[in-house]
Amino acid sequence: MSQAGTGVCGNGGQEDSAAAGPFSFSPEPTLEDIRRLHAEFAAERDWEQFHQPRNLLLALVGEVGELAELFQWKSDAEPGPQAWQPKERAALQEELSDVLIYLVALAARCHVDLPRAVISKMDTNRQRYPVHLSRGSACKYTDLPRGTLSENEAVGSGDPASELGNQAST
């Protein structure tokens, strides 16, 4: 059985993000602002009739495909998107925006409060991926070695928002 951070699951081949420096999003627009902007855009064009969950999901998948095309056939040895040419960076920005717009629209149509859902999901991830078992490991939680500590002891009593960047996603 592998130890956390070594073994079969590996470390995910993380890029050196320190070279790019720290990044943070601008505080605006909020997800609610994005939801409202898109709802107004669709209403002005009488497109709400087409925005059923299935259609929004398929549009989202299509946009994710367009985003994936930007990365297709690029080698892992090539510099990351931070070093792309301006035209490629602009396309990346547009496709990521399309993905976010459709994700927010789908969540709104399904009445899912994304910020609350993210906090809940990160709490679940924190329980599934205790730091002492998952640090440096790309293993799925079902494949992590189990130590002698219970999940409650391993998770600790820290603030749920404090470790958002330290957990693997599922």
Swiss-Prot record:
Example of a GO MF term: pyrophosphatase activity
One GO cellular component term noted in the UniProt record for this chain: mitochondrion
Pfam family, one: MazG-like
GO BP terms in the entry: dCTP catabolic process; DNA protection; nucleoside triphosphate catabolic process
Keyword entries, A-Z: Acetylation, Cytoplasm, Hydrolase, Magnesium, Metal-binding, Phosphoprotein
Sequence positions bearing N-acetylserine: S2
Region: Disordered, residue numbers: 1-25, 149-170
Cofactors (names): Mg(2+)
Function: Hydrolyzes deoxynucleoside triphosphates (dNTPs) to the corresponding nucleoside monophosphates. Has a strong preference for dCTP and its analogs including 5-iodo-dCTP and 5-methyl-dCTP for which it may even have a higher efficiency. May protect DNA or RNA against the incorporation of these genotoxic nucleotide analogs through their catabolism.
Entry protein name: dCTP pyrophosphatase 1
